[in-house]
Amino acid sequence: MKTTLYFIYLLFLVLLFGCNDTKIKREIQQLQSKAISFPYNMNFTIHGRDTLISEYVENGLKLVIYTDSVECSSCVISKMYLWNSIIENTELYKDKLKFYYILSPQRQHIEKVRSALNVIDFEYPVIIDTLGKFAKLNPHLPENKALHTFLLDENNNVILVGNPLRNKKIEEMFYQIVEEKLGKPE
C-alpha cells in the first residue's frame, strides 16, 4: 500500500513538472512566433526626467527587460544596478547592442516609479509605458514574468529568452550569441 501511494505521488510530481515544462516551451514558442514591435513614441527617462531619444529603435541587437503592471516596478528599479556589469561588458559594441528597460506600472504608481528612477544611480534610459502600448502591440508576450527578458535580432525576432542575471547558462548564451552576431568587441 505504501509503495503504491509513493508511486502515485511520484507520478503526480512527474506529471506536474512535465506539464510546467511543456507550458514554458509553449510560451517561448509563442513569444518567438512573431517579431516584437515597439511603439513609435516611447517616453525615455533618465534619472526620472523625460529624455527624447529618437534614434533608439533601430537595427542591431536589443535586450528587452520588460516589467508589466502586475510586477512591482519599484522592486525592479531597486535592482537595476545589477545590470551595470552586463552593460559594462557589452559597451564595446557601442550602438550595435541596445538595452530596453520597459516599465509598465499601474497608473497609481507612475509618480512613485519616476521618483524611484530619480534616486537610483542608473545611467541607462528607461521606458515608462504608461498606456501599456508595448503589451498591446505584442499580444504574444507570455504571462510568465521569467520570460519577460529576451534578446532580439536586427529584425526584432526573439533569439534568446531568459534573464542572464538569474541564470548562468542564459548569461553564457547571451554573450555567445552577441559575439556570433556582432563579432569580438572592438
Which role does the model predict for each range below?
Residues I53-I77, W83:
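Short active-site neighborhood of thiol/selenol oxidoreductases, capturing the structured segment around
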Residues K2-L10:
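Sec-dependent signal peptide recognition
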Residues S69-S74, Q106-H109, L165-R166:
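Short acidic, S/G/P-rich loop/turn micro-motifs used as interaction or catalytic elements
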Residues R114-A146:
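Short, internal strand/loop/helix patches
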Residues N20-V57, I77-K79:
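N-terminal "domain-start" segment that seeds a small globular fold
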Residues L15-G18:
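C-terminal motif of bacterial Sec signal peptides marking the signal peptidase cleavage site
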Residues K145-A146, L151-E186:
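Thiol-/selenol-based redox modules, centered on thioredoxin-like
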Residues V76-V119, K133-K136:
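Structural microenvironment flanking redox-active thiols in thiol-disulfide oxidoreductases
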